[in-house]
Amino acid sequence: MQKKIYIKTFGCQMNEYDSDKMVDVLNASEGLIKTDTPEDADVILLNTCSVREKAQEKVFSDLGRLRELKFNNPDLVIGVGGCVASQEGDAIVKRAPYVDLVFGPQTLHRLPEMLKQRRSTGRSQVDISFPEIEKFDHMPPAKVEGATAFVSIMEGCSKYCSYCVVPYTRGEEVSRRFEDVLAEVAGLEAQGVKEITLLGQNVNAYRGEMADGEIADFALLIEYIAELEGIERIRFVTSHPKEFTQRLIDAYAKVPKLVNHLYLPAQHGSDRILAAMKRGYTSLEYKSILRRLREVRPNISISSDFIVGFPGETDADFEAMMKLINDIGYDNSFSFIFSPRPGTPAANLEDDTPHEVKLQRLQRLQAVIDQNTRRYSDEMVGTVQRILVEGPSKKDPDELQGRTENNRVVNFAAGEHGARLIGQMVDVNIVQSFAYTLRGEIIVKQ
């Protein structure tokens, strides 16, 4: 019987990408195939995230539930990867000695060797080192199902925002070689992928070495990927405003395949709080980026992150954030109350704002964002949108769903066209809007 692997993924798209790579690596080396049922698995991996509060406790809670599976099947391999693993290291094994493997984001390619060592020595294996970009040299070719795919172009972050653990868990910024990224995208194109999402903690900082020794910036990488005929859409996350260059803005003018949507986290609107966060820009500088971008893409959809209740945030600071939100008119936002991450400078800052006040601020902020989201969706009714059909609708398996350029899910009846539309670009007339989705009718070309 073929052995199986189960992976539970927490957090960002980078982790989703890494989880797919774990499956690829262990399929190539061990013949493992993916299962959605932990009880059926021979290997169980938790790919963790440490960005939010109590991340470690959530991991140990999950490990506690897996302990019984290990008791009933001593040959079961349990591993913890990702950013919590990078932070905690040996402490995970000390607290949960039944864990076999602990590995960081940069060492997932070493899983086959770690498994081998675990079996031969009987001892838990821990490797949370930062061997730069080495992991991409040991990856088997990507295998995908569907018309969309993630491609990691760089690892780590060197910005050291005062609240963020990423530089400590994923290391400094390191870019993949230019031709390696293009080769991966071309391989995905050959498998029928039409939409690529380029990933990095700060994609704007991409500086990939080319075959001739020159260095390619992010804008040049986008331009080359756009030359691949089968790739029809290009997305990317995450961007840091400090390095959102004029060259990248110019790419929006020159590359129609860049979608009409940008996720550009502001985090706050008060210059005083932005300085305390060590973000490296002012509210005015942030708005200047979007003003110049909207000169070349007037209707571009903008989403962001906002942290409410950063230590020392006053009513005036919060009002400055609300002013930024109203000035920009965000389409969507990931907004949350500040939670101190151990080991970061912000964790040591005095926080005298009551939780009730933070909660009220968050609710007010999110209400404005939600109004914007609904208004933009309502304005799409009566328009024709080109969508990439991703598969059956989650609401009705007899229907299909796709996604617009501005990241709206559209559900529609496929009729006689059926499943053959999956993976195709089609035009739909938007006939109804809901809180987070749209309803469309497919336009049949004569």
From Swiss-Prot:
Essential cofactor(s): [4Fe-4S] cluster
Domain called MTTase N-terminal: residue spans: 3-120
Alphabetical UniProt keywords: 4Fe-4S, Cytoplasm, Iron, Iron-sulfur, Metal-binding, S-adenosyl-L-methionine, Transferase, tRNA processing
GO molecular function: 4 iron, 4 sulfur cluster binding; metal ion binding; N6-isopentenyladenosine methylthiotransferase activity
Residues the entry annotates as binding [4Fe-4S] cluster 1: 12, 49, 83
Compartments, as annotated in UniProt: Cytoplasm
PROSITE patterns documented for this protein: MTTASE_N, MTTASE_RADICAL, RADICAL_SAM, TRAM
Manner of cofactor binding, per the entry note: Binds 2 [4Fe-4S] clusters. One cluster is coordinated with 3 cysteines and an exchangeable S-adenosyl-L-methionine.
TRAM domain residues: 378-444
Gene Ontology cellular component terms for the protein in this record: cytosol
Domain of life: Bacteria
Enzyme nomenclature, EC number: 2.8.4.3
Record field: catalytic activity: N(6)-dimethylallyladenosine(37) in tRNA + (sulfur carrier)-SH + AH2 + 2 S-adenosyl-L-methionine = 2-methylsulfanyl-N(6)-dimethylallyladenosine(37) in tRNA + (sulfur carrier)-H + 5'-deoxyadenosine + L-methionine + A + S-adenosyl-L-homocysteine + 2 H(+)
Major subcellular site: cytoplasm
InterPro entries for this protein: Elp3/MiaA/NifB-like_rSAM (IPR006638), Methylthiotransferase (IPR005839), Methylthiotransferase_CS (IPR020612), Methylthiotransferase_N (IPR013848), Methylthiotransferase_N_sf (IPR038135), MiaB_methiolase (IPR006463), rSAM (IPR007197), rSAM_horseshoe (IPR023404)
Sites where the protein binds [4Fe-4S] cluster 2: 157, 161, 164
Domain (Radical SAM core): residue spans on this chain: 143-375
Family of the protein in this entry: Belongs to the methylthiotransferase family. MiaB subfamily.
Function: Catalyzes the methylthiolation of N6-(dimethylallyl)adenosine (i(6)A), leading to the formation of 2-methylthio-N6-(dimethylallyl)adenosine (ms(2)i(6)A) at position 37 in tRNAs that read codons beginning with uridine.
Subunit structure: Monomer.
Protein name, per record: tRNA-2-methylthio-N(6)-dimethylallyladenosine synthase
Gene designation: miaB
